[in-house]
Amino acid sequence: MSKSQIESTWSSLLQELEIIWKEVGETETEREKILIEIEEECREVYNRKIEKVKEEKIRIKQEIADSEARVIDICSVMEEPPILGRHHQSDQQSGNGRSLKDELVKILQKLEEMEKRKSERKIQFIQVIDDIRCVREEINGESDDETCSSDFSADESDLSLRKLEELHRELYTLQEQKRNRVKQIQDNIRTLESLCSVLGLNFRETVTKIHPSLVDTEGSRSISNETLDKLASSVQQWHETKIQRMQELQDLVTTMLEFWNLMDTPAEEQQKFMDVSCNIAATVSEITKPNSLSIDLLEEVKAELCRLEELKWSKMKELVLKKRSELEEICRRTHIVLEEEDIAVENVIKAIESGDVNPENILEQIEYRAGKVKEEALSRKEILEKADKWLNACEEENWLEEYNQDENRYNAGKGSHLILKRAEKARALVNKLPAMVEALASKITIWESEKEYEFLFDGNRLLSMLEEYTELREEKEQERRRKRDLKKHQGQVTSEQDKGSVTKPQSAKKGLKVSTNKRFVSSPHTPQTDSPHSAKSNQSFSTPLSRHG
């Protein structure tokens, strides 16, 4: 309502009052008094209205101030600069400013906006803190609600992006720790599963005892410190068990292989445990086959060892005889004579049957002796090969001597050309004998110098055999020279007799011839003259080995 309208209304009311007063007959004094009362009442109404408006103004200003303070607090909590844009006082003074109500509406809108942003920021904080709480709970294995709630209440005055970023970094660190724990859990579970497979254990039962969630391959698994410790402890325990069983199995298999070798167990009987025997030199990481270290397998191997143990005693006599025969065969091939320390077969059997000795000890002695003989045979190999060649050459030499003494050797007959070829080869070989003997003697001398004991051939010193052969060969050579000289002398005597027979009577010539023939009739090649070497020359058809046999 405008001012003119108010004045018009006030005038009409006064006129109406004047009319009534006239009709009533009120005096001027009463009229003045009533007008004063009306004016006083109007003043009071105006004053009340003014006070009320002032109070409203104060309230609006206070609300504006409170809202501004709230906005400033929210900006402070969120670490943002307060942007209010309040200029109503200066604007009002200049007469063109916004009213307090307009300012209140504006600040309330700003407050609503900031409250909304704070609420959104708070939701972000709650989400991050809740994620942190969940990860901590998984890691610690216990509820962490109280800690998280108290942390949030203490930090509610700080909802800044900086604080939110710190929480995000903390969450990332915890999530990284969680990922590492999950990987560690998975690795340990795979290791435990492999150990259970090798040891023949029930994997589900084993892992359930640690934590039931570890059985579930799709759901969430426990990654708490307690679960990690229990899982690592279980892996360590079964790994040590694997090592113990592996060592036990390898010891059992070693004994089983010894039994197999000892008793020459057929391959078909060994086939059942062939996979087990393959692990005799395996490392812990190389044993991965299921049930390869199970209790059942160990018991099976132990049962087989018990069977072999029982079988061993029944076959021990046979084994001793066999090993002894093998030793004798090795000695025969290497021309080594068994020493007195080697127990005779008859005595060995009697000792085993009486129980006075352990058959295994006897076998060990025989195998040890066989090993020593084989070791010595390696060092004797070259000399033995040369000795065999020498003995073969000696046999050819004897055959050639027999052949040369055969008066019918040049008679043509079946196979005579083959005999002539052999004689040719024998002469070539015999011509090499001196060099062969010298080389062999040199080898033997070096060998005896290195070993510091004599080289024996079937119990005889081989060097002595060579020396004896050399002496005999020289004696035979001297005998052959003596025969040639004697034959030459005999030819000269015969020639002189033939010259004198022209003047002597026929009877005298005949008597001399008979006498001469009687003198050498004992042998077509060997004269009857007593010679210091005649006894040895009769041995010319024997070999060095036969002389020392």
From Swiss-Prot:
Keywords: Coiled coil, Cytoplasm, Cytoskeleton, Microtubule, Nucleus, Phosphoprotein
Keyword Cytoplasm attached: yes
Annotated site (Microtubule binding): A412, A423
Subunit structure: Forms dimer. Binds to microtubules (MT).
Molecular functions per Gene Ontology: microtubule binding
Record-stated family: Belongs to the MAP65/ASE1 family.
Signal sequence annotation: none
Coiled-coil portions: 36-123, 160-199, 459-492
Localization terms from the record: Nucleus; Cytoplasm; Cytoplasm, Cytoskeleton, Spindle pole
Protein name: 65-kDa microtubule-associated protein 9
Bias (Basic residues) ranges: 481-490
InterPro entries per UniProt: MAP65_Ase1_PRC1
Example of a GO cellular component annotation carried by this entry: nucleus
Positions of post-translational Phosphoserine modification: S501, S546
Polar residues: compositionally biased ranges: 514-549
Annotated stretches, region: Disordered: 474-549
Any single GO BP term: microtubule cytoskeleton organization
